[in-house]
């Protein structure tokens, strides 16, 4: 089994989402000791946001007369897509920033959403090509957004990720959430304990 861990928080060791992604991967490895793990830290070498120039290369594949930088960006994009497609399990660290995902994570999504590779257009609509994998989303939030409709309407984080992954054909998605972590030490500890309890269940091997 190949596990791909994606981290997007710039907070380093202070990041709650990184704490959760590390715990999720550890639990999965406990259940499947021979699993191969790759880590993509989107804050160490963040992919550039798409410009008009980059769109022509990495999205529309106009490949004549590429500059050295364009060749590098094309190679990076293809590597990110290959890495995503090769993974059996993807663990995504996704803190909520201003009601949505960090800019680094959005830039990664823009690279892996590739027509002809992770989805394709048909006469009846788009079809995802990246199915057959499991995704865990380590969702962290300073406030609480899951308990009432008014706050849930502000969620452009988990809902966005489920939409994008579904578009790519990935429907086996589990969200492990720690919310309210900015509402004081007690709320933070309670949220982390609840998330860890969910994670601990992943460490139990599945009977053949």
From Swiss-Prot:
RNA-binding recorded as keyword: no
Which superkingdom heads the taxonomic lineage of this protein's source?
Answer: Bacteria
EC number(s) on file: 1.6.5.-, 1.7.1.17
Name the residues that span the membrane.
none
User: What is one Pfam family matched by this protein?
Assistant: Flavodoxin_2
For this UniProt record, give its keywords in alphabetical order, as a comma-separated list: Flavoprotein, FMN, NAD, Oxidoreductase
- Note accompanying the cofactor annotation: Binds 1 FMN per subunit.
As cofactor, the record names: FMN
Q: GO terms for molecular function, please?
A: electron transfer activity; FMN binding; oxidoreductase activity, acting on NAD(P)H as acceptor; oxidoreductase activity, acting on NAD(P)H, quinone or similar compound as acceptor
Q: Subunit structure, briefly?
A: Homodimer.
Annotated function: Quinone reductase that provides resistance to thiol-specific stress caused by electrophilic quinones.
- Similarity comment text for this entry: Belongs to the azoreductase type 1 family.
Q: What is this protein called?
A: FMN-dependent NADH:quinone oxidoreductase
Organism field: Azospirillum brasilense
